[in-house]
């Protein structure tokens, strides 16, 4: 006999289902469940007197016969491809199924077999996202990794050697010696990692040497001289070795203007960092480059979103990061040329239009490594408040009930798009079968601010945890702490290190004594803006050289700075 349960009681028991709506944190962003892969009346849930018990939701199947290692029950998956309710099956550190979990001996339509060897994680009432990817890291200190992990980031790509003056300014790990040491250091860090070599050279030999030493990409930075000759040489090496090139262009226009840089790039794929320009790049019009089909444009989070404090804080940050002297007028003028309210305001709107595809941190070098996801969804909130629903959301025949298209656009900026840009999307960047089980569980009220649980390679690596001497896990002080996957020999199989294919073919991991799985980056040279999910628009962008006003397809792009933001002091005391 069927039993009917009202919608609120159902959501409280099994999590929201199709048509239910959820607010993300304290923003104005409303998510609506698009589909439910579970079966009403056949839901699985763990606990005393509940379903996942021997002979009920738990089968007799062994692991050898197909039972999963872990099941996440009744999860609300938020990813670039959809917003769905489902059970998630994990096995051997990977996602093996998304659908309906249970016991196939007594229930039809089971996609995920629960057996005696299966652990259960309660996904009811939680949003599950892929671990975020921060593709603009200055590896200034190892403490960044824990801070990033605590925010929901599970992959970091960038360059550096520690707090060297070069690293403080540029995301480069220069030379084979330093790349080797950073790859060895990665062995003890609870994060997927990849390192960029220095790409600033006009001849190829030193760049090839770095790729063969394990660099997963090359970085062109103006502080090392991003000339047209260096751009052309670096891209030529990248094309031969299939690694990505990231670029911070010439703010002072000493070696050429933005037109010269576009000409030097020559239609080849390139990831442009802080494409608005406050983080560096041709003043005042580097932002134009986001309209090029071969360019993968990203932002760094200090300008995300545009607020009443954005301009003021940037000057001091810039002086410190780029080793400038406030007593030298030319250094001050250099800094001031990069900070323009008009282009920062336009950046908000270009993100909302899907013309900027990626958001990253610029960690400790004008960016905050623990705020990538927060700043991304603060930007989405600001645009919802100032610009209203996206046309795709407003076109909902039931009225503008949700912000699903906007939410999927912004989640893609910190997950799948940086993965595609850097050739690692076969392994990370989305909640899809076959991918590494790098997953983040959020309580909706804390979404984007403080994860409840971070799963890394199928094992829990970070979680909100109470007093270890308490009788139960929940008494305070509750805060994020590393879990067992971050320790001992469990760390290596839980994480990946990304290298060039050429380095792996020379047996570099064994030569360096690396224990972690070393994965080659692939398909970085044949992609373009069209491959950036939910963020592939190509407006014609123009900048007035006198007023710095930005136009896209002839329309002026401007917005007011935010006076206050969600996901801020309500959650964070410091």
UniProtKB/Swiss-Prot annotation:
Explain how, and how many, cofactor molecules are bound: Binds 2 nickel ions per subunit.
The record lists substrate as bound by 221
Q: In which pathway does it act?
A: Nitrogen metabolism; urea degradation; CO(2) and NH(3) from urea (urease route): step 1/1
PROSITE patterns linked to this entry: UREASE_1 (PS01120), UREASE_2 (PS00145), UREASE_3 (PS51368)
Cellular localisation: Cytoplasm
Q: What is its EC number?
A: 3.5.1.5
Keyword hit for Hydrolase: yes
Q: Name one GO biological process term.
A: urea catabolic process
What is one GO cellular-component annotation here?
cytoplasm
Coarse class of the protein's main subcellular location: cytoplasm
Question: In which domain of life is the source organism classified?
Answer: Bacteria
In residue numbers, the region (Disordered) covers: 384-403
Stated family: Belongs to the metallo-dependent hydrolases superfamily. Urease alpha subunit family.
Q: Which protein, by its recorded name, is this?
A: Urease subunit alpha
Source taxonomy:
Bacteria, Bacillati, Cyanobacteriota, Cyanophyceae, Synechococcales
Name the gene behind this protein: ureC
């Amino acid at each position: 006999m069927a039993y009917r349960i009202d919608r609120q009681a159902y959501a409280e028991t099994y999590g929201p289902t199709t048509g239910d709506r959820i607010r993300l944190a304290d923003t104005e962003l409303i998510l609506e469940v698009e589909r439910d892969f579970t079966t009403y009346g056949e839901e699985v849930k763990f606990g005393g007197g509940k379903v996942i018990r021997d002979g009920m939701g738990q089968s007799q199947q062994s692991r050898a016969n197909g039972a999963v290692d872990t099941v996440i029950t009744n999860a609300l998956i938020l990813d670039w491809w959809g917003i769905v309710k489902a059970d998630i099956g994990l096995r051997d550190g990977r996602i093996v199924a998304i659908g309906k979990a249970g016991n196939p001996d007594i229930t039809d339509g089971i996609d995920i077999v629960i057996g005696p060897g299966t652990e259960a994680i309660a996904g009811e009432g939680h949003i599950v996202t892929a671990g975020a990817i921060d593709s603009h890291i200055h590896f200034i200190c190892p403490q960044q990794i824990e801070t990033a992990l605590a925010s929901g980031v599970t992959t970091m790509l960038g360059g550096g050697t520690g707090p060297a003056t070069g690293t403080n300014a540029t995301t480069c790990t220069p030379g084979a010696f330093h790349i080797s040491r950073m790859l060895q250091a990665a062995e003890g860090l609870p994060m997927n990692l990849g390192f960029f070599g220095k790409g600033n050279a006009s001849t190829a030999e030193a760049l090839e040497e770095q790729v063969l030493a394990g660099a997963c990409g090359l970085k062109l930075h103006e502080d090392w001289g991003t000339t047209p000759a260096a751009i052309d040489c670096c891209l030529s090496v990248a094309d031969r070795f299939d690694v990505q090139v990231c670029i911070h262009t010439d703010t002072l226009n000493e070696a050429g203007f933005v037109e010269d840089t576009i000409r030097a790039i020559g239609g080849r794929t390139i990831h442009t960092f802080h494409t608005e320009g406050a983080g560096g790049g041709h003043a005042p019009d580097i932002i134009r480059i986001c309209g090029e089909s071969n360019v993968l444009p990203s932002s760094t989070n200090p300008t995300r979103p545009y607020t009443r404090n954005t301009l003021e804080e940037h000057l001091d940050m810039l002086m410190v990061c780029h080793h400038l002297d406030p007593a030298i007028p030319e250094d001050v003028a250099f800094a001031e040329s990069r900070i323009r309210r008009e282009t920062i305001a336009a950046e908000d709107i270009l993100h909302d239009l899907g013309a900027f595809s990626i958001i990253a941190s610029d960690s400790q070098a004008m960016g905050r490594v623990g705020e990538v996801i927060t700043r991304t969804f603060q930007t989405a909130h600001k645009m919802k408040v100032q610009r209203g629903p996206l046309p795709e959301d407003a076109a909902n025949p039931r009225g503008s009930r949700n912000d699903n298209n906007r939410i999927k656009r912004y989640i893609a900026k910190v997950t799948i798009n940086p993965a595609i840009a850097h050739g690692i999307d076969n392994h990370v960047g989305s909640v899809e079968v076959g991918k590494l089980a790098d997953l983040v569980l959020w309580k909706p009220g804390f979404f984007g601010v403080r994860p409840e649980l971070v799963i890394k390679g199928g094992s829990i690596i970070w979680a909100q945890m109470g007093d270890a001497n308490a009788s139960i896990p929940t008494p305070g002080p509750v805060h994020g702490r590393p879990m067992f996957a971050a320790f001992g020999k469990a760390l290596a199989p839980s994480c990946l290190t990304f290298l060039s294919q050429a380095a792996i073919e020379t047996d570099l991991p064994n030569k360096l004594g690396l224990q972690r799985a070393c994965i080659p980056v692939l398909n970085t040279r044949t992609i373009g803006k069209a491959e950036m999910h939910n963020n592939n628009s190509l407006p014609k962008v123009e900048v007035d050289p006198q007023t710095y006003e930005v136009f896209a397809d002839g329309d002026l792009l401007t917005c007011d700075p935010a006076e206050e933001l969600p996901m801020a002091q309500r959650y964070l005391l410091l």
